[in-house]
Amino acid sequence: MKIERFEDIEAWQLARELTRKVYGLTKKPRFSKDYGLKNQIQDAAGSSMHNIAEGFDSETNPEFIRFLRYAKRSCTEVQSELYVALDEKYISALEFNDTYEQAARTRAAIYGFINYLRKYAKRKTVN
């Protein structure tokens, strides 16, 4: 499959779904009132998606990989923040597990894409 747009990247698609899930959780009444955690987890989820898109416009694969690493770290941040939401009883164990696993799938896809770029993709050249 040829990647012509950032939307074609599987990791971006998974990050978009992660962001959708996080925004859904943060609309819950108790969660929505914890502005600090709500903003932090929304920012982290969005960052996973946005860094993939931003990195897509990089001039070189090493630069793209740097943005993908940021995206991967943001997924881990979401996972950590989900524990706070669970501990504060803002979300159920089922919601925690579902969203945690979405973050894990996204993180794995990003990691796989990083490895692909390192091993197989030719270096991008400046147009």
State each model region's role:
Residues 1-127:
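Short, C-terminally biased terminal segments at protein or domain edges
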